């Protein structure tokens, strides 16, 4: 359901998103309040993002208003997982680390190497990135990698250690805020 709703969100104007969600969830949240909160959480980035990403992040901020005792609140964080993926791909393309959008579809994120618990950009793949940008890109991919798979894919439920993660509302809200902050950091 959340995936379908997030795709619908990408297709409509930002101004219509709150009404769609208000009708879906039978609540009343003002669109101006959501836009103000996007600016609050992303003061450096809110006016620099592509339209599709902005819509997805508006949806994520809207999801911060959804509260309650849910069985699984993971779906609330789904928009920011998609947004951080798109954000990372845009940076890699803009800094000429990848030649085009198709590269990651064919090769995945092969420009990273794991060092301990973190990932870093392989030195031969820096493109036009500065030292500071290389560090940011490594942190961004580490964050993306450590959150996406355990939230978006089901692990082996028969294994002794199932790493599939389900978020309660509080943890989903925390992940949303941390992701917004990480994206905003790039534009500081």
Predicted regions and their residues:
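Residue-level detector of well-ordered alpha-helical segments, enriched
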Residues: 72-79, 140, 147
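Hydrophobic alpha-helical packing segments in soluble, helical-rich domains
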Residues: 76-97
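Flexible secondary-structure boundary motifs
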Residues: 93-138
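Short, flexible helix-adjacent loops and helix caps
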Residues: 65-69, 92, 96, 156, ...
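Charged alpha-helical initiation segments
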Residues: 12-75
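Short, charged/polar, low-complexity loop and linker segments
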Residues: 59-68, 124, 128-129, 153
